[in-house]
Amino acid sequence: MFAPEVISREDRDGGYIETLLPAERGEVYYRSCVGGICRYSSDWFQAEIYLNQMLQP
């Protein structure tokens, strides 16, 4: 199994959202991460929601 290619990254307030391109054919998806915990989504706006939720104290 091959790792996805990170095609962009946006850092914000101690977390980030990466835009990922699958190694094999498929659609772009997003990874929201804070402190080593990540959530995945197929929608940029959902990735923003995940990041905001994980950044809240």
PLM region spans:
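Short N-terminal "domain-start" leader segments
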Residues: 1-29
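A short, charged, amphipathic alpha-helix used as a generic interaction element across diverse proteins
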Residues: 29-57
